[in-house]
């Protein structure tokens, strides 16, 4: 049975060695990179199952590296590993498309557990279903793709899952907690503003295709819904 692969981008040798040992004990195949640019080169040819990414790299910002990796592989699970713990940094990472965020100092066992959680989330939403049209949207679950006015949207995994959830119940008002429970397997580890951040980026991507329509409604004090289509 082929082992699941983890790419670890971390320039602190001690941290990298500890994580490699723990991840290998958990059965993962691990490849370590001290810099970000070699990761981009390799990602053009292959993709890991999970990426663990330090924000403070010597050759490229971890945030910028994440952007470029997700442009190549939109469904790539990304876990940020960093000394930064301020809310603005967490929100920036989530807005870029990262899935989770662990601040140093951390427990290596916690990192391994979060990697397992990310993989469960991927598998949970990987069951294919027929392509369906909903108003001006087209939902292609096997390809993890949604089109708007016949134009494919470049979505991160959680943007895709959020929009898919709204698409399947047009007109229904979803609270933030309901959306977190539906999309994030471990909703208790998800920040309240995570949903707002992803909705904001979704709206921007929809507006870039058709600035005259705004299909996602905000219901103050209640949550979000998709307009009846």
UniProtKB/Swiss-Prot annotation:
Annotated coiled-coil segments of the chain: none
Main location: cytoplasm
Regions recorded as binding DNA: 129-228
Gene3D superfamilies: 3.40.50.2300, 6.10.250.690, Winged helix-like DNA-binding domain superfamily/Winged helix DNA-binding domain (1.10.10.10)
GO biological process, one term: positive regulation of DNA-templated transcription
Family annotation (InterPro entries): CheY-like_superfamily, OmpR/PhoB-type_DNA-bd, Sig_transdc_resp-reg_C-effctor, Sig_transdc_resp-reg_receiver, WalR-like, WH-like_DNA-bd_sf
Annotated keywords: Cytoplasm, DNA-binding, Phosphoprotein, Transcription, Transcription regulation, Two-component regulatory system
Compartment annotation: Cytoplasm
One Pfam family named in its UniProt record: Response_reg
Modified sites of kind 4-aspartylphosphate: 54
Post-translational modification: Phosphorylated by CreC.
GO cellular component: cytosol; protein-DNA complex
Tagged with keyword Transcription: yes
Superkingdom of the organism of origin: Bacteria
One GO molecular-function entry: cis-regulatory region sequence-specific DNA binding
Domain Response regulatory: residue ranges: 5-119
Biological role stated in the UniProt entry: Member of the two-component regulatory system CreC/CreB involved in catabolic regulation.
Protein name: Transcriptional regulatory protein CreB
The organism's taxonomic lineage, starting at the top: Bacteria, Pseudomonadati, Pseudomonadota, Gammaproteobacteria, Enterobacterales
Gene assigned in the entry: creB
